[in-house]
């Protein structure tokens, strides 16, 4: 490759990071809610992801539970600071809800999990830049895509100008305004509340109402206008959930925002993080129990069948980044305090389902569609189109919350056929001949490790103090998208990981802990990049110094590509 081309490749992530920063500044200046939503420690976290933590003088043995992006980021910054880190992952792969499907025949990719990052997520952009990942534009909106409701089909550039043509009996003051503008009309009262009450009190008020209550009540929208928002903007997924959560989500998810994606697939992010680690990453290693003592934490993991033996690892500190349902399956001794148990039970995960269909050619290009999404009131709800020159693997359906119920319980074949029917209804029967008969379905509510797509809280039924997951329980710390705002985004998981890492790095641990012969710090020093879980029932990680343990399903960067799933 020519030197000039190499220089350009190096500059791509830097330039995109600068563009994202400028886009964020422009969007922030226009969004009156941005200041209220902004994390007070955001700039500090940005510095940590850029420069790392201060080098520790007292390395600690840290066990990170979960190899999703939160666990991997925390492991990286703690390892870089000099701590001895081991990651335990119950699944047979890394990445968590970052899950890239790769078609073995065509090379086309589809994102079963995370697929975009808004320009306001500067921490995530900086992380990708630091790992050498190339970013490019994610097309959220294309004016030539379609909206079909009540058997009326219009191009989205028409819907933006005259949404009443879809058949909604809008009030005179609602007609001629885009769905986004109608939503902003409803937020006028919320803006007044922000100015009168301040962010803290206003958000507490918003947490007590559903989005539907607010839009019809204080928002003073007509029922047809609210139905329009539900059909066209998928706001119906929030209708019975907290208005505060809807506000947070809308600050990151709008067709008017700018988004980026990772060139080559989002799974390159966890792979890049993995390659930067020096400690153990154990797969197929579900944590079943934790016992805190005065000097360390004993972590029990279950080995793979048929033995199902328990093994014990010791650490000075544990960071729990697993999903809420996974954490609830762990036995804690002493038990988690009541307020933490209640906080875990309060976590409300909504289902999320994606259905991809593979076609022989990108037929949507003939309709001048080069990305973005179409909307339908049929079961598939949202259809996302891949960018030009990236194949014909179509995200034929993306549903979440109550809308995902349409695909629950269906067989893989039934789910594919249902999505195909909806695509054919929108684009014509010719798509049936163009479908190559293959596809992939991912239902996150049925994933045994996440048991849900992401967290969105319902209204608070009574006044409670906000759950503060940044406060550790003894030697146990918490991170993950469920522990911070806004829920459901990769950057949120990263922010939570950085906060936990800062606290762990500043913790004053006894020097003797780091050299304990009963711990596993010595194993980590001797083994370097060993990935897998011990398969021998009698193998004791704490006693194997300077040698590689037997591994089961050894992980490498080459075998993390994903085959078709039947979920």
From Swiss-Prot:
N-glycosylated. GO terms for cellular component: acrosomal vesicle; extracellular region; immunological synapse; lysosome; sperm midpiece. It is found in: Secreted; Lysosome; Cytoplasmic vesicle, Secretory vesicle, Acrosome. The keyword Disulfide bond applies. Residues 1-21 form the signal peptide. Keywords: Adaptive immunity, Cytoplasmic vesicle, Disulfide bond, FAD, Flavoprotein, Glycoprotein, Immunity, Lysosome, Oxidoreductase, Secreted, Signal. Induction: By IL4/interleukin-4. Expression is up-regulated in numerous cancer and metastasis: expression is induced by immune checkpoint blockade. InterPro entries: Amino_oxidase (IPR002937), FAD/NAD-bd_sf (IPR036188), Flavin_amine_oxidase (IPR001613), Flavin_monoamine_oxidase (IPR050281). Glycans are attached at residues 54, 134, 220, 559. One of its GO terms (biological process) is amino acid catabolic process. SUPFAM superfamilies: FAD-linked reductases, C-terminal domain (SSF54373), FAD/NAD(P)-binding domain (SSF51905). This is L-amino-acid oxidase. It comes from Homo sapiens (Human). The lineage of its organism: Eukaryota, Metazoa, Chordata, Craniata, Vertebrata. The gene is IL4I1.
């Amino acid at each position: 490759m020519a030197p000039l081309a190499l220089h350009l490749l190096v500059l791509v992530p830097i330039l995109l990071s600068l563009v994202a920063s400028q886009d964020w500044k422009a969007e922030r200046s226009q969004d009156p809610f941005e200041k209220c939503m902004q994390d007070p420690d955001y700039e500090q976290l940005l510095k940590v992801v850029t420069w790392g933590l201060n080098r520790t003088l007292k390395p600690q043995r840290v066990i990170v539970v979960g190899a999703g992006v939160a666990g991997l980021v925390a492991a990286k910054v703690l390892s870089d600071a000099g701590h001895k880190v081991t990651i335990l992952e119950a699944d047979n792969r890394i990445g968590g809800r970052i899950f890239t499907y790769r078609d073995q025949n065509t090379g086309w990719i589809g994102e079963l999990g995370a697929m975009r990052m808004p320009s306001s997520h500067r921490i995530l952009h900086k992380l990708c830049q630091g790992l050498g990942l190339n970013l490019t534009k994610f097309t959220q909106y294309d004016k030539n895509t379609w909206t079909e409701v009540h058997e009326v089909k219009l191009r989205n550039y028409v819907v933006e100008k005259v949404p009443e043509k879809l058949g909604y009996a809008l009030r005179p003051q609602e007609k001629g305004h885009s769905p986004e503008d109608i939503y902003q009309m409803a937020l006028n009262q919320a803006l007044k509340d922000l100015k009168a009450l301040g962010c803290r009190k206003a958000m507490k008020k918003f947490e007590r109402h559903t989005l539907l209550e607010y839009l019809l009540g204080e928002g003073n929208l007509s029922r047809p206008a609210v139905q329009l928002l539900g059909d066209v903007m998928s706001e119906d997924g929030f209708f019975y959930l907290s208005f505060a959560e809807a506000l947070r989500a809308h600050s990151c998810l709008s067709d008017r925002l700018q988004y980026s994606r990772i060139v080559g697939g989002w799974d390159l992010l966890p792979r890049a993080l993995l390659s930067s680690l020096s400690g153990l990453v154990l797969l197929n290693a579900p944590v079943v129990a934790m016992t805190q003592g005065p000097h360390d934490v004993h972590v029990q993991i279950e080995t793979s069948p048929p033995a199902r033996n328990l093994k014990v690892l010791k650490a000075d500190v544990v960071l729990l980044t697993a999903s809420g349902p996974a954490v609830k399956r762990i036995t804690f001794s002493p038990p988690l305090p009541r307020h933490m148990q209640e906080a875990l039970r309060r976590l409300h995960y909504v289902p999320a389902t994606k259905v991809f269909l593979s076609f022989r050619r990108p037929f949507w290009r003939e309709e001048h569609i080069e990305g973005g999404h179409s909307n339908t009131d049929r079961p598939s709800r949202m259809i996302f189109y891949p960018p030009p020159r990236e194949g014909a693997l179509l995200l034929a359906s993306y549903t979440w919350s109550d809308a995902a119920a349409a695909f629950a319980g269906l067989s893989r074949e039934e789910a594919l056929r249902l999505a195909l029917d909806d695509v054919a209804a929108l684009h014509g029967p010719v798509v049936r001949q163009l479908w190559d008969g293959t596809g992939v379905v991912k239902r996150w509510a049925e994933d045994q490790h996440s048991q849900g797509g992401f967290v969105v809280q319902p209204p608070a039924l009574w006044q409670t103090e906000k759950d503060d997951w940044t406060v550790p329980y003894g030697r146990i710390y918490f991170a993950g998208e469920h522990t911070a705002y806004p829920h459901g985004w990769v950057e949120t998981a990263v922010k939570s990981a950085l906060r936990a890492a800062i606290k762990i790095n500043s913790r004053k641990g006894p020097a003797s802990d780091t050299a304990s012969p009963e711990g596993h710090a010595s194993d980590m020093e001797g083994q370097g990049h060993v990935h897998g879980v011990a398969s021998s029932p009698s193998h004791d990680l704490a006693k194997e110094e300077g040698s590689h343990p037997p591994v089961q399903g050894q992980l490498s960067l080459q075998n993390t590509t994903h085959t078709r799933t039947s979920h």
